[in-house]
Amino acid sequence: MFSATDAAFSGFREGRENFRTLLAWIPILGVLSAAMVVLMIVFAGPGLMAMQQQQPATGSDPKAALEALKPVGALYAVIIPYCLLFYGVLYAAVNRMMLRPSDRRLAWIAFGADELRQMAVMILLGLLYFVVYLVGAIAVGILAAATAAAAGTGVAILVGVIAGCALLALLVTLAVRLSLSSAQTFATGRINLFGSWALTRGHFWPMLGAYLLAAILAVIAYIAVYAILLLVVITVGGGFAAAGGVFAPDMTSLQTYFTPMTLLYQLLAMIPAPFLLLIMVCPAPSIYRSLTAGSAA
């Protein structure tokens, strides 16, 4: 058994206990995050800015709207693989820190079979959730249409809402019950999507509570940290106009994006980033470690 509260606070605990080692994550995550921004600007920056400006005018013109969406397709083609790599390395590092702490390497960061398996798990889980959502959404639509034909629009709306809530509950159940797939795959050294389902039997509500509490803590921490960053930007930049340039930057080019204030903000945001990430990522391996203590799961 595990404590939902302990799991929810595991990110804070790991951050405190491994503070010095995690300092190495600051420049690494900072460089990776900056690289993501550069990719966005290089591959789709001008197009995204143009799309923002043209969106109201193209709403009634499907051809123009489709043309405006081209930058998004180019962006996804680059960002999705990059995010898989980024989070594959990140999740493997957190799992290594919590489940194999003696294997420090470069502050637990590496790139090898463990990271590739994490990427595979993300892809497979993403496909699973997409298929379940797609099939469920089609079923809800058919049910609502059949109800409308048989009993009228009012009843169909009610049935559609209830069926939609049931689909949402199914997706949440899947997400919670399969949430240990990453940790289990790392610990066993083989891709295992559904072993988590058996492992979490009887623990759904404590796990859901732990994840919800961790999410609330993460939101509070993010608000506190970025309120401080906003205050610094306003103070140094001389007013709210500086903050506007930071939170709504001009992505037309690298030169227009990386202004002095944006660079200052990015550098400051690098510092808390690893510790904020731990709040959301650590609960799952913490729960896995507790549930498998003394076993070979």
What are these regions (language model features)?
Residues 1-49, 167-238, 265, 297:
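Nonpolar helix-loop interface/hinge motif
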Residues 1-13, 52-67, 83-152, 177-204, ...:
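Membrane-interface segments at transmembrane-helix boundaries
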Residues 22, 26-34, 80, 84-85, ...:
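Alpha-helical transmembrane spans of integral membrane proteins, capturing the lipid-embedded, hydrophobic core
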Residues 34, 38, 68-103, 154-190, ...:
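Selective recognition of hydrophobic, aromatic-rich stretches within alpha-helical transmembrane segments
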Residues 38-57, 134-148, 227-244:
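Membrane-helix interface motif
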Residues 60-67, 198, 240-264:
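Short, membrane-exposed interhelical loops at transmembrane-helix boundaries
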Residues 144-163, 236-252:
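Membrane-interfacial helix-loop-helix connectors in multipass membrane proteins
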